[in-house]
């Protein structure tokens, strides 16, 4: 594989990662599909995916840096507030949202690793799509928490319970948390914003652990490829997050669910038939 070819693969996969990581469509499903089509699979590919995920995480940090610093009591200028009441999102909300998935993830780590195969990803894409549709149909007409600062401790914990579904590869962490948020009375926009904020510590922890385990597959010769993938994922994720938050004010998640079914069909056609 030539250097130019590697850089093209890095750019394409960085584009896919940045576009899908925070949308409720499953980045895992897309990376499996595209990686297979490009012939980029194996230990090096898995390590590359871990590295470019850090680019996506950085996009969230840049997008919500003021809010993230506020969670730990560091404020720059006016303190952001998005809600109809006097409540405020705190670090406790984030911790409550993390606990269920962290506990289940640690207890079932080995079993979860066995789920990383195309067939399980295909099923997760379908079930996650059904959950998105259910969230749209069953959500309260008037959400109890229209803004992210209205989210209660109970709602944060319940969203965290839904996040456990994302331990199933292909389910989509954002899809699980946003759907869960809507079902417990959080508005579509606020649930999406909370999902992004919750992603930072969750993904840093998971990605950091995966990167540590993958250090043996890293070499300086791969630096240009990994750098291109990282930067591409960062830029595309930044654009994707801004666009997504703008779009969901106007449309439901049902189109995303339908798209998931299409991706599941593609996985079936490529890996099962």
UniProtKB/Swiss-Prot annotation:
Membrane topology: Multi-pass membrane protein
Family (UniProt): Belongs to the UppP family.
Note: Bacitracin is thought to be involved in the inhibition of peptidoglycan synthesis by sequestering undecaprenyl diphosphate, thereby reducing the pool of lipid carrier available.
Superkingdom of the organism of origin: Bacteria
Stored PANTHER family: UNDECAPRENYL-DIPHOSPHATASE
Transmembrane domains' residue ranges: 7-27, 45-65, 89-109, 115-135, 152-171, 189-209, 221-241, 253-273
Pfam families documented for this protein: BacA
Protein name stated in the entry: Undecaprenyl-diphosphatase
Intracellular or extracellular location(s): Cell inner membrane
The entry's keywords: Antibiotic resistance, Cell inner membrane, Cell membrane, Cell shape, Cell wall biogenesis/degradation, Hydrolase, Membrane, Peptidoglycan synthesis, Transmembrane, Transmembrane helix
Enzyme Commission numbers on file: 3.6.1.27
A GO BP annotation: regulation of cell shape
Catalytic activity of the protein: di-trans,octa-cis-undecaprenyl diphosphate + H2O = di-trans,octa-cis-undecaprenyl phosphate + phosphate + H(+)
InterPro entries, sorted: UppP
Function, as annotated: Catalyzes the dephosphorylation of undecaprenyl diphosphate (UPP). Confers resistance to bacitracin.
Cellular component GO terms, alphabetical: plasma membrane
HAMAP family: Undec_diphosphatase
One annotated GO molecular function: undecaprenyl-diphosphatase activity
Chief place where the protein resides: membrane
């Amino acid at each position: 594989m030539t250097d130019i070819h590697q850089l093209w693969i890095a750019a394409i996969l960085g584009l896919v990662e940045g576009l899908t990581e925070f949308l409720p469509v499953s980045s895992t499903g897309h990376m499996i599909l595209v990686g297979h089509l490009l012939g980029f699979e194996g230990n090096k590919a898995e390590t590359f995916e871990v590295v470019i995920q850090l680019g996506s995480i950085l996009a969230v940090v840049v997008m919500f840096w003021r809010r993230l610093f506020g969670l730990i009591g560091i404020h720059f200028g006016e303190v952001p507030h998005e809600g109809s009441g006097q409540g405020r999102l705190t670090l406790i909300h984030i911790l409550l949202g993390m606990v269920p998935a962290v506990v289940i993830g640690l207890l079932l780590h080995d079993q979860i690793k066995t789920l990383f195969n195309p067939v399980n990803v295909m099923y997760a894409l379908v079930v996650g799509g059904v959950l998105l549709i259910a969230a749209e149909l069953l959500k309260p007409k008037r959400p109890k928490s229209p803004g992210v600062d209205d989210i209660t401790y109970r709602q944060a914990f319940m969203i965290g319970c839904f996040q456990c579904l994302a331990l199933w590869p292909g389910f989509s962490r954002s899809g699980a948390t946003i759907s869960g948020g809507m079902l417990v009375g959080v508005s579509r926009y606020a649930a999406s914003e909370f999902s992004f904020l919750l992603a930072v510590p969750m993904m840093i922890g998971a990605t950091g652990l995966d990167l540590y385990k993958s250090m043996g597959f890293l070499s300086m010769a791969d630096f240009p490829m990994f750098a291109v993938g990282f930067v591409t994922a960062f830029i595309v994720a930044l654009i994707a997050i801004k666009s997504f938050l703008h779009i969901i004010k106007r449309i439901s998640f049902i189109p995303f669910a339908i798209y998931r079914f299409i991706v599941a069909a593609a996985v079936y056609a490529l890996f099962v038939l």
